[in-house]
């Protein structure tokens, strides 16, 4: 590997988790990253030895936080995150997302989102190279 190529080496493979309520913005981010990274490869700005790890058809990972009847939940990541640079995007102020508790629809509170975030980090079990949480306030009203 040539020394000039080293400045373009990512630390780990990119992976994005979009929590419930952030699906649209995460899909936009994913489309942009796929297009941008393919462009970088096409221009020859990335080391040829890591092109396969650098580009993907999608950087989104499928995760679930199923709820039990009592409102408790568990975090599940359906693919490997070993060695990835993991970005988790969660909007803690989106009251449009609901779940069933004791037979009633209940809006998710900021604490519910934060607990789900902790569940997903725990489900990753220390395997990602780095974990970055992005918590924009997308739906906050004045």
What are these regions (language model features)?
Residues 1-142:
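PRPP-associated nucleotide enzymes
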């Amino acid at each position: 590997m040539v020394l000039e190529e080293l400045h373009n080496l990512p630390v780990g493979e990119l992976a994005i988790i979009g929590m419930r309520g952030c699906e649209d913005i995460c899909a936009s981010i994913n489309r942009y990253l796929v297009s941008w990274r393919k462009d970088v490869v096409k221009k020859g700005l990335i080391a040829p030895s890591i092109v396969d790890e650098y580009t993907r058809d999608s950087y989104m990972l499928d995760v679930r936080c199923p709820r039990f009847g009592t409102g408790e939940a568990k975090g599940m990541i359906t693919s490997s995150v070993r060695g990835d640079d993991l970005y988790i995007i969660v909007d803690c102020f989106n009251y449009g997302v609901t779940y069933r508790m004791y037979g009633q629809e209940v809006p998710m509170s900021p604490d519910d989102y934060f607990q789900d975030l902790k569940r997903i980090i725990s489900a990753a079990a220390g395997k990602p190279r780095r974990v970055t949480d992005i918590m924009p306030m997308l739906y906050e009203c004045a």
